[in-house]
Regions:
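Conserved catalytic-core motifs of GNAT/GCN5-like acyltransferases
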Residues: 32, 110, 123, 128-145
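Short glycine/proline-centered loop/turn elements that form peptide/ligand docking sites
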Residues: 92, 114-118, 135-140
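Acetyl-CoA-dependent GNAT
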Residues: 3, 7-81, 92-94, 98-102, ...
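Conserved GNAT acetyl-CoA-binding A-motif
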Residues: 99-110, 133
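Conserved catalytic core of the tyrosine transesterase superfamily
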Residues: 43, 106-112, 138, 143-152, ...
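Active-site acidic-Proline motif in GNAT/NAT acetyltransferases
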Residues: 79-81, 85, 113-115
Length: 165
């Protein structure tokens, strides 16, 4: 399965929210929160469509102010039928490349402790666990594992070359 990525804008938020609510349920962002983040100049959001249709198959967002040393993966979601086809990796690599272009030296993220598939993806990209935020995801009271990737020049390309997907 092949996917096309493009920069998300306000017009994409309705489709993003369909996947957001079906993926994250009680943890889902509100439409207003998503719209504010997508429209924010320090954020970079991508949407992915299947090459066979224009239907949204995934999205991901990065907070990375130009020149700031730290960036944060805000969110990532992949539709169930598009999982295990490399789309999560493709989205993450694109965000890591953008973080590098904006001058970030470190990228952080939080991942649910009960999501081993996402944890594995982040491990293969070179992220390491640096701590736990107890009860971070509410109302489910699920812990968040905090992860960090120290970027070196070309880190995204190196991660892509080392892909096991």
């Amino acid at each position: 399965m092949m996917f096309t990525l493009h920069r998300a804008g306000p017009a994409d938020v309705a489709d993003i929210m369909l996947l957001e609510t079906s993926t994250f349920g009680s943890d889902a962002w509100s439409p207003a929160m998503m719209l504010a983040d997508v429209a924010q100049p320090h954020c970079y959001y991508l949407v992915a469509t299947s090459e066979r249709s224009s239907e949204l198959r995934g999205y991901a967002g990065l907070l990375s102010p130009q020149g700031a040393p730290d960036a944060d993966i805000q969110t990532i979601a992949v539709a169930p039928d598009a999982r295990r086809h490399g789309l999560g990796r493709q989205l993450m690599l694109a965000l890591l490349s953008e973080a590098e272009l904006r001058g970030a030296r470190r990228v952080f993220l939080e991942v649910r402790a009960d999501n081993p598939a996402a944890q594995h993806l982040y491990d293969t990209l070179g992220f390491t666990s640096i701590g736990t935020r107890r009860g971070y995801y509410q109302p489910d009271n699920v812990d968040a594992i905090v992860m960090r990737l120290d970027l070196a020049h070309g880190a995204a390309q190196k991660a892509e070359a080392g892909s096991d997907d």
